[in-house]
Amino acid sequence: MPPAYQSAFHKIISRDKGVFEGHNFLVSVDTINWIHVNTLTITEQGQLFSSDSKDNHYLLLQSLQSCFIQIYPDSNISGSGKSSISQPPPTTSTRRNLLRKSSNLNSSDQSHSKSSEDNEHQPPAILIKTFDNDKLYIRIPSKANFGNLLSCLMVWQNLKPQGLAKKWYCENKVIEGFNPNAPIYELLVCRFKIYGPLPNKYKNLNIVPGPKAPVYQQKMDDFKANFDNSYIITPQISSDNHNSINEGWFYAMGALNSHGILNFISELDGTLLYSIDIKQILSSEIREMHNSIFNSSNILFIGQLKELRYNNVIRTLSTLTPDQLLTPFLTRDGKIIPNNQRILIEFPLHIDLEDWFVGLNYFAKREYIGSFDNESKLIHNVEHPQLYDFSKANFRVSKKMSIDIIEAKFENTETNKSGKIYAEVRMWGFPWSRTAIVNHTNNPFWKEEFSTDLPISTQMVHILIKKCSFNDSSYSTGDKLIGTVYVTPDILTKQIKTTSTIMTSSESSQAIQMNTVPLSSMASNSNAGLDIVRLTINDPNNIPIGKLLLEVHLQEYHILSPSVFKPLEKMLVNAPMKDLIKFCNENVPSSDFERVSLVLLDIFQSLEVEDDWFKSLMEVELVNVDIMTRKNYHQRNSQDQAVSNSKTQQQSSHNNVFNTLFRGSSIFSKSLEKYNLRIGQEYLEKVFGDFFAKISNEKKNCEVDPRYVRIQERALRKGKSIHEATGLENGQNEDVSDDDDDDDDNSSDDDADYNAEKERERNERIKQMVEENFQNLYGYVEEIWYKIYITSNDLPDQIKLQLKNFRTKVELVCDPEDKVTSLNCLSAFIFLRFFCPAILNPKLFYLAKNHQTGSTQRTLTLIAKILLNFANRQEFSPHKEPHLVRMNVFLRKHTPEIYDYFDKLTGRKNDFNEKILDLSHEVKRFDLGLDKTSNELPTTPYLIDKYLRLTEIVHLLDYSKYVKNIGNNNNGSMSNLGTPVNSPSRDMEREQDRSRSRSQSGTPDLDPILNLSDLKLNYENKYQIGSLEFEKSEFLELTGDNETEGFIKSLCKGNEEIFSFINSNITLKDIQKQSTKIMNKIQELEIYLENYEFPNNYKDQIIWDSFTDDIMNKCWLDTSRNCLIYSDHVPSSNNQYKKLVDHAFSGLKLKFNDHQKLNGNSTMNSLINNGGMGNRNGHDVNGHNNNNNNNNNNTGDGYNETDRNQRLSSTFSTISIGSAIKPNTSKNPFKKWLRKN
């Protein structure tokens, strides 16, 4: 029995799979010159060909993927592509003239009645506009060809064009097994402060003061530019001045339930304020707010970013405005609450933010690059599968961007500049970061870095230079805009060498359609490898007013599904960490130590083996120390005293080496430094936050250097403030101080006695100032050391554990009598790399709102210097810093305490200090109970994206990029290829090369891959997405499979020791092989997704039928332009859009050559409702029996070319649309519209 189809469109799409062939058409590229073609053909590759009577073929359109389709019911076609419906109806005489011009009838002396009759029988036309902006008009005289061609074009509209970014899609992973009838329970509950609409009756709300949150400010320039160039959309502009939503900060209870609904509940009476359906939010719309916006690092943004959503849309397939893409955001009892499409949540602790960030992203729509392939299968067994029930070949995209705003230089020096300015990073109409507020000079300086994750579709970033309008010490939504800087795709992709989702200007034809903005003019840079660029600042009138110096860095990685990384995870847990460290030391430039160290730290911390990682790092770092210690011990116990005496100077140099241990940059020092700052960030905030605010507010003078105090005293005599005097001490206005000295000298010649007395008074006053400043400084140092000392028990246990292990390791390799080196090493990490950087630059660690300048910065510098000397147990010398010698009193007084402090941190003494900070790391973390789909989400704590980091290590360990070099020199060391010239291991490698050339034998201990053949990879062209030959599990990979694990254990007869040996006997080469394998899969998938989509990607008929249903369910007719669009949802209140399956064509008065109108329910409605009737009744166009052909149709997509034409016309036959057409093959149906020539 033949399958039942909902409509003729369903049947044609399901059967023909985008292939078309029809006869007798008129085509044109400008609606003026029309050409008759005998045959039109659409191939399986999406190419549109025409053929003439001599069987000559011509390519009309190269690719139909994501093409724009517009229908012209009559002949009123203009070159601009506007539909006749969007224009006033022309008069009879006007229509007659247009038809005469476009048709050029063979007989120019036809009567008026004949011409009028011809005009009424003009067939409809279809405009095809490809994604690459090629246009073609086609006039179609036959109903059968019209229906079949339109069905075919609908298939190609839903196939994506070339480019990775075009394969963007989003999906809810949780909905796949979602049961709406399942009991609702709460996953997360928290009391927090939110910024959102205040309910009308908010007496029961705990409203608190706070900074006003910015609302959406439109910056889009081309919402009006539609793909068909026919309509001008003027969106409503939302600004602060017209914001009528009453918003504010208030406390509320938040509850995220198991159905993905976030409820906000009044904490006083328990009433529901409003709710958000997180399942309607994109994952890129849940974002952490930068500390600079609200002076808090615990604020989360949740909203609908209309510009971001608009950029995700392929414009050829949609005419929806940005506002129409939004869904109801805040609701209460099914009613929409007026809102600004975003709320802000401030959590009490950062660990709360981390838990909620993961929980919200669990329900949100996750974004991928992907497409269906021949291995797409049903994820769940359902009776009537939808397209989203099938798997895709996909990967996640991570685009981490960092912008370091250094300084600006304004060109117009004549303008009187005063007040304060700052820079603001803006995306999608919202600010996401701000610099500190500085003086408005010709050359303002910031040097502040902002890092964030860019969504897939984001191609550009704006940086606004603003001037404070109301308060020079705070930001305001009404601050004046001075200029704008555009960070364009060309700048973002300077260092990306692989396939990227960001399209540069040279690839604009393939880029996502986005806002057109002026390109910034870059200054010539001789070193293209540098990230530092100088971009033009344009004022609101788009006139250049200066340059902004900034450093832009973007890293893009394509991340496969977590299952691909399981074997690699198993290997890294049991990895030979020392070999890995040696590999990094030999192949990673010192400039990349910090980045690679953080990657490795994140990996091993997420795998919960960071303790083993740090132990290996320590042992590798201390090897040279151990060797040096042994040499010193041998020299000290040598029988030859003469030799011993001659080595005295060398031993002294060795002692200097011990004193400077771990003061430089290495993978270990960078890893432990990052680890301590990550774990101890909250500790620093609670210990130092109030202290820095106190120093900034009190503004006490702590300068104890008499030279600077003399300058301050002189400035005070001139009536200047201490702040201005501090400007003098920092090197400003040096000429003024010199003039003062000259004045003093000149006056001293006139009256020596009087000036001598005055000078004595001045010296006495300076002495008093120094004493007063010393007491201020001493008090601050006492206070900060007291805060550090009494909170030794509050320092996170993770930090203390690493310091304990570190001290033990150092003592083992040092001389037994050496009690100094280990303490100096502790000081290098706990003070030099932890406390002192936070003191010197509080804003960098979010401990202060603005940069510390003037006397405050000088005070902090002195405090850090004193603490560092104190930690090193080193007194100040009268020869170097005589003004700080008096602080030796503090050092001697508290020396026992510093020893006691180090012993407590490293577990040598019991710490009986009471815990007073109540840090969040003491709070027990609970399991959210999420399913396996949460594996790809960041891990808690610290929101580590484990699979991003594994992808980065795969790129680091992959050797396939060196294939050419290996082919040229098979005997060369692989490590040499990646080792920088300034690497500390280069000398050792050169020595190894010389030894290798002499002996022609011997390999490094690491046994690096000398030839790619060592990897034993099969490079035959058998890589196919899904069936991937290289995915076949090798022995080591089998440990990642539970069933295979059991099988191996059974082979080992249950011997756990043998199985553990298999699992732990991993070499670096094994990890490199696995990395190369994953890298190959990423590259293969990139190539596949970079290409166009084709119908043959849907191999299975079941998935093709689901694809057909998906096309018809999303297809709408925009009646204002008569074009087809595709969307999951269209505003129900808008009558502009009609669903195709709901008789959308009934309003089009389509006229064909048989004088029958496709109008009303009797014609086109029968096309929708009675699809395939002709075949089911067993008749062809002429009414003849066609049962054999019908039986062939039931076989699915298999049919031969000989009956293609007959079958193409059978579904849209005259019987299926309820009318009869008399065939007329003897005459050309377009004869009366063709020109004479």
Curated annotation (Swiss-Prot):
Cysteines paired by S-S bonds: none
Q: Which UniProt keywords apply?
A: Cell adhesion, Coiled coil, Cytoplasm, GTPase activation, Virulence
One GO cellular-component annotation of the UniProt record comes to:
cell septum
Where is this chain compositionally biased, Low complexity type?
79-110, 1183-1199
Q: SUPFAM superfamilies, per this entry?
A: C2 domain (Calcium/lipid-binding domain, CaLB), GTPase activation domain, GAP
Site Arginine finger: which residues? Answer: R663
Which SMART domains would you find in this protein's record? C2, RasGAP
The record's annotation in Gene3D superfamilies points to:
C2 domain (2.60.40.150), GTPase Activation - p120gap, domain 1 (1.10.506.10)
- Single Gene Ontology MF annotation: GTPase activator activity
Q: Report residue spans for region: Disordered.
A: 79-124, 721-762, 969-1007, 1170-1204
In terms of InterPro entries, this protein maps to: C2_dom, C2_domain_sf, Ras_GTPase, RasGAP_CS, RasGAP_dom, Rho_GTPase_activation_prot
| Chain ranges of the C2 domain | 381-503
Coiled coil residues, start to end: 1065-1093
Q: Which PROSITE patterns match?
A: C2, RAS_GTPASE_ACTIV_1, RAS_GTPASE_ACTIV_2
Q: Where in the cell is it found?
A: Cytoplasm, Cell cortex; Cell tip; Cell septum
**Annotated Basic and acidic residues bias:** 111-121, 986-996
The name this protein carries in UniProt is GTPase activating protein BUD2
Q: What taxonomic lineage is listed for the species of origin? A: Eukaryota, Fungi, Dikarya, Ascomycota, Saccharomycotina
What gene name does this entry carry? BUD2
